[in-house]
Amino acid sequence: GYTPTMAPIQPKLGYSHYDGENWFTEENDLDNSFPGFVDVTLDPNNENKAFISSFGSTNQINTYQTGGLFVVENNEITNFYNNLNSPLEDIYETNPLINSVTVRISGSVFDNQGNLWIANIGLSNELKKFSNGSWTEFDISAGKPENSFGLSEIVIDSNNTVWIGTRDDGIIAFNENGNRITGLI
């Protein structure tokens, strides 16, 4: 979870899911504890695969606590994307005075071509697309007021326009075809 100012809460509770008959729970591991989970996106082509968005903050750079995107398939974490292995970014990466890694993924959604769109808050390229193992980044700052911070829910319509809620500044609409960005307040 996160606070009203988009700071990670990090309750470290793990995650659970119900398969129609049984509950499965992955509890927190003290050696590599979980950050605050904020959103779950199911793969439309694989009901046993989920992408879990998280907010993290830690001074231990090679742990789940950094925050990022978890890929869970058949009840196992099969991948974890953060600033070390993907374009997902640490919001403090450019500040050498802060001895912490803070990756904040507020949500994700699949489009009708199977691409996963990801909101990575607090950066210039806050919108990412993950397609067939490749990443693309988009600068959506033109759709936000200056000094705006924080993205929330992310959805896609039938025209493949990505709609992203903001913390206090309305909605951003982005369409990759023509690289169109609009801020609606």
PLM region spans:
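Carboxylate-rich, polar loop motifs that coordinate divalent cations or form catalytic acidic clusters
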Residues: 1-185
